[in-house]
Regions:
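N-terminal cap/lid subdomain of alpha/beta-hydrolase-fold enzymes
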Residues: 66-126, 133-140, 322-329
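Gly/Ser-rich "nucleophile elbow"/oxyanion-hole loop immediately N-terminal to the catalytic nucleophile
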Residues: 72-73, 134-151, 158-175, 180
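Short beta-strand immediately N-terminal to the catalytic nucleophile in serine-hydrolase-like folds
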Residues: 176-178, 203, 308
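Accessory cap/linker subdomain of secreted extracellular hydrolases
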Residues: 88, 95-99, 103-109, 115, ...
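Loop/turn elements at helix/coil->beta-strand transitions in domains of secreted/extracellular proteins
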Residues: 62-63, 75-78, 116-120, 170-174, ...
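Glycine-rich nucleophile elbow surrounding the catalytic serine of serine-hydrolase chemistry
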Residues: 178-188
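Bacterial N-terminal signal peptides
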Residues: 7-21
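Alpha/beta-hydrolase-fold serine-hydrolase catalytic core, especially in secreted/extracellular enzymes
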Residues: 26-52, 56-61, 195, 276, ...
Length: 409
């Protein structure tokens, strides 16, 4: 009996003590986070300010853009690039308090853009990186290949409309420029353009993907582009990376046997654009109906345009010359369509243009182009009270003599 009482007493004590212990037990110690809930970087001494915005389109989709505004800007023109290559990256090639360093890289004539006081805007196209919506490779304009009411022309229009109404530092004039795919989006902005679009500089643009730009070169499929298509279409942010089986691509092509086999080994049947390439190996209506030069030939000439051609462009050797032939006849007084041709590879006009491989030109041809062709073109059409334009219809670098020539249309 005594033992029973002892057990019952101990149980009662435990029953009372355990809840008290649970309530009274202090929480384990924790170190406070050193990362603030929201960090506000200081930009003291920066020669620009930066905004990250999401611009609404007419269908409700929002497109992500980076806006860089020089300190003290007033009545400044806007230079816009629309890209599938990540606006965040193209606006931050380096991390710096100086705008010229931030923009020093692909798609940016950083010396002209920063020295001349332009507001720089870089926007992710629909469906890529920070932008909402569906991505379509070289999205066609509204028509047989695009039954929707949305294309690059409408997105460009809506973007420009938002910019001129939300950037009080601007003079309301916008220029489009871009290289390669971004040259393609620049040309698309010429279709039913916004009234504030006053100049366009398509550099090495994709124009006809079968005739001579990117995918086919007059019917010869460029299997080297499979890796580009894979990374561009597999994910919104290019997270899926093309993997190699050989150190040398040539050995890989020999080993795999065909472009189709190489694509299948990487699962590319899942990608919409690859399916279109397989379905349209010939120059059928699929390619003809999205050839940008054909479209622009049927459009009124509304926007002054400077086409930039690289004489040794390994990717888009066809497009800018084709567009020049299509729209130049409309420029009867030689005041709105210009062509510059330099001794560069694809995109070489924004880099050091002193040489091509081992061939040296005796000067930085790209710098000369930017200072003597690009700058006066942009100044004339975008700046307030700009000086008269003295450009020849064609400005071309002549190899051998290594001199720039001013040529008639």
């Amino acid at each position: 009996m005594w033992r029973l009482r002892a057990v019952l007493g101990a149980a009662a004590i435990c029953a009372i003590a355990m809840p008290l212990a649970c309530v009274a037990a202090p929480p384990p110690p924790a170190l406070p986070a050193e990362t603030p809930a929201e960090f506000h970087p200081l930009e003291t001494g920066f020669d620009y300010s930066e905004r990250h915005v999401d611009i609404p389109m007419r269908d409700g989709v929002k497109l992500h853009a980076i806006i860089m505004i020089p300190q003290g800007a007033a009545h400044a023109p806007i230079l816009l690039t629309r890209t599938p290559y990540n606006a965040e990256d193209l606006s931050a090639h380096r991390h710096s308090s100086h705008m010229v360093a931030m923009l020093d890289g692909y798609d940016n004539a950083s010396d002209i853009e920063s020295e001349d006081g332009y507001i720089r805007v870089i926007e992710d196209v629909r469906g890529k990186y920070g932008s909402q919506g569906a991505y379509i490779m070289n999205r066609p304009w509204k028509g047989p290949l695009n039954p929707t009411e949305i294309d690059h022309a409408t997105d460009t229009y809506d973007t420009i409309d938002w910019l001129v109404h939300h950037l009080p530092q601007s003079n309301g004039r916008v220029g489009l420029l871009g290289i390669s795919y971004d040259g393609f989006t620049t040309l698309m902005g010429l279709i039913n353009p916004h009234p504030a679009l006053r100049a366009a500089v398509p550099m090495n643009p994709m124009v006809d993907g079968w005739m001579g730009d990117d995918w086919f070169h007059r019917g010869a499929f460029r299997q080297i582009n499979l890796s580009y298509i894979y990374e561009q279409e597999a994910t919104r942010t290019n997270d899926a990376k093309w993997w190699e089986t050989h150190y040398d691509d040539y050995d890989m092509y020999l080993a795999v046997g065909s472009a189709g086999a190489l694509a299948r080994s990487h699962g590319m049947e899942q990608l919409g654009f690859y399916q279109k390439l397989v379905a349209h190996p010939a120059y059928d209506s699929f390619w003809q109906d999205q050839a940008v030069d054909r479209k622009l030939a049927a459009e009124p000439l509304r926007v002054p345009t400077l086409l930039v051609h690289s004489l040794w462009d390994q990717e888009d050797i066809y497009g800018d010359i084709a567009v020049y032939k299509a729209i130049k006849p409309k420029d009867t007084d030689n005041s709105r369509v210009f062509l510059a041709m330099g001794p560069w590879h694809h995109g070489g006009e924004i880099r050091d243009g002193s040489a091509l491989g081992q061939v040296r030109w005796g000067s930085d041809t790209a710098l000369w182009f930017r200072q003597h062709v690009l700058r006066p073109f942009l100044d004339h059409f975008l700046k307030d009270d700009a000086p008269p334009l003295g450009l020849a219809p064609v400005t071309a670098f002549e190899t051998g003599t290594n001199e720039w020539r001013r040529l008639p249309a």
